[in-house]
Each structure stands twice: as C-alpha cells, then as structure tokens.
C-alpha cells in the first residue's frame, strides 16, 4: 500500500504540463481493436487504467508495445471476446470492450464493470442500444454476455445523456450493416475524440459533439497514428489546486474551450484566470467567494470536478451548495473532508457547504479517483500534515500527481508501506 504525506500551506507556483485525457484513452484503446492493422496512439496518460487495458488486450490475443506516453496496438491476432475478470473488474471503462468485441466478433462476455465506488451507475442504456442493433443480452454469474447473428443499423434514442453509452454504441455500430442514428447523445470532448479516432481509421461518423450522431457502417477499418486530446479534468484539478493554495500556476497543453464551465466558476469565486492558446494561468490574491454548482452533461459543469471544488467552497466565505445531477451517492468523500474541519451536510443530491476559511491536516482515505484528488488539494491548502491513504484510486487516473505538484513547490511525498 502507498500513501501521500503532504505538509500544507505552501502556495503552488510554476508551470504544469497536462497529460492526455484518461476518459479518451480508455475508449480509444478498445476502439483500436476494430482495425485490421496496427495503430499507434500518442499523448497517452501514464496511469494504472491504461496499464490494465494494455494487459487485457494482450490476454485477448493482441500485440501491445507500450512506452510511457505512446502505445502500438496490433489487433490482427485477436482471438478472444472474453476478457479476464481479475483485470476487467478493476476499471469501469472495461465496458467499452463490449462495443468493440461485439463489433469484432459479434459476441462479448464481460464481467460487470469495476472502477470507482460512487453509487449506482447502470449500463441499461448501453444494453438497450446493443439490443436495438440486433444483439441478445444475458447477465448471469457476474458476467454480461452479448451476442448477435449480425449487427444492423438502428435508430436509438438514449433516455438519459450517457457518455459511456454514446461511445459504446459508436464502437458497436461502426461496422454494422446500414445506418445507425443515435439521439440525445453526450457531447463531451472525449466523445468527439473517439469519433475522430474511428474516422481516422476509416469510419463514417458524423455529428459527434451534437445531440445526434449518424454512423454509416463500413466493411473494414485500418489502423492509424492518433494523438489523444489533453485531459480537461486533470487541468481543472490543477487549476483548483492553484486557487486553493493562493498560488499562481500556468496550466500548459490544454484546450481552453473544454474548460469554460470550470473557468466560469473559478472567476465567480474571485480567482484570476487568464487564457492563452494552449495555456491557462490561474492565480488567487484575495478571499474566495461562495458559489452554487450544479453538475450537468457537457458543456455544463463536469461531475468529475465537484469534488475538487468542494475543497474550494470549504475555504470560501458563506454557504455554498453542490447539486449532483449525474450520479447518485457521489458525496462519500465528504466524510473524509470532515476530518479536516469541513462543515457540510448532505440532503439528497445536494451538499450544503459552510465555508470555514481554513482546513487542518489529518489522515484521510482516497474514497475514489476524484475524491482522492480532493483529499490531495485539501492537504495542500491545510495547516499541518495530511496523509492520503489508498492512493491507488488516484493513480488510476492522474499521472505522477506528486511529481507534478513537487515541481510547483508542494511539500508532498509518496511513501510505500
């Protein structure tokens, strides 16, 4: 087991380079399995979820050559549609293998997805879509089995906006016979990124980033060289860390338009934000103001950023409210922040946070990936020493977090116990 030990109270200063988008990468790697030749994917984040996916692809018969930020995937030897449970159950995004393997073999057997324990996250919209394409679904003994004689295009309306279902149905429909129309689609940047990757391999996908996506099935895809977009959530995390510590940080290698909702809330709180081509400067010189936050599908405020912002709201003047509209039960991390002096109560989908001005160091657990990031930010801003335990959650989605923070002047070390 490993933990972070943080001595707080030091403003972050300097420049941080943002890695490739986790949420893109975990879908692009399964998408590469659809080609009849190798693909090279770069700007890959060096995180645990990518290591897990690479190992799964090897177990399925694919060849993988992985560097730190680049991977070559050769799917020509793929011979299995049944990823091993011990690997696939580690990460929720393993469900993208369903769409990819269903498209490749007309069959997929996947263990129920793992990842962060943040409440009910059903995959009913995925299953509804697969069945509309002609597949049959059974769930037994902890596995999802999906099988089709032939996949045929269909008109599919998602009952709720779902990033996972939108991407998974693109993967499944890309080689299906005829035309597939997806309506009420997610518009997140990584949805567009996956569509761009598939199109670079020869797919015919139009409308990604809008409510309606049209997919005209093609007979074959060929591998390509592709660069993943920067990680908007990692960028947002460092922007919040700069504000929480009263620092001055240049967040480099970003697409500012992907961060508009995050920037808007920081500015509303009194943080100074300057935008350049691929750099955002974040600095705080005065007190933080209270704000209310409602998580919404993109371009609304991202659910993955409410946890870091909760720390900022604890340091602000007045009472703020976070309303979580995407996932149920995504406030478990707040119990840990209470140990550091946070005043908060949860009422249904809302967390009411009373600003306390300062936090104090304490031993806390990273309850999940983004909750773990919130613990680190709290530790950086707090008086005294904070220990963040169970940091494997953080390593699943943040590349070398302590190394990047050390370069900004943070007093943070990783300890192996």
From Swiss-Prot:
GO terms for biological process: cell division; cell wall organization; peptidoglycan biosynthetic process; regulation of cell shape; UDP-N-acetylgalactosamine biosynthetic process. The active site is at residue 116. GO terms for cellular component: cytoplasm. The modification 2-(S-cysteinyl)pyruvic acid O-phosphothioketal is found at residue 116. GO terms for molecular function: UDP-N-acetylglucosamine 1-carboxyvinyltransferase activity. UDP-N-acetyl-alpha-D-glucosamine binds at residues 92, 121-125, 304, 326. Phosphoenolpyruvate binds at residues 22-23. It is found in: Cytoplasm. Its EC number is 2.5.1.7. The keyword Cytoplasm applies. It catalyses: phosphoenolpyruvate + UDP-N-acetyl-alpha-D-glucosamine = UDP-N-acetyl-3-O-(1-carboxyvinyl)-alpha-D-glucosamine + phosphate. It is an enzyme of class 2 (transferase). InterPro entries: Enolpyruvate_Tfrase_dom, Enolpyruvate_Tfrase_sf, MurA_subfamily, RNA3'P_cycl/enolpyr_Trfase_a/b, UDP_GlcNAc_COvinyl_MurA. Keywords: Cell cycle, Cell division, Cell shape, Cell wall biogenesis/degradation, Cytoplasm, Peptidoglycan synthesis, Pyruvate, Transferase. Pathway: Cell wall biogenesis; peptidoglycan biosynthesis. Belongs to the EPSP synthase family. MurA subfamily. Cell wall formation. Adds enolpyruvyl to UDP-N-acetylglucosamine. This is UDP-N-acetylglucosamine 1-carboxyvinyltransferase 3.
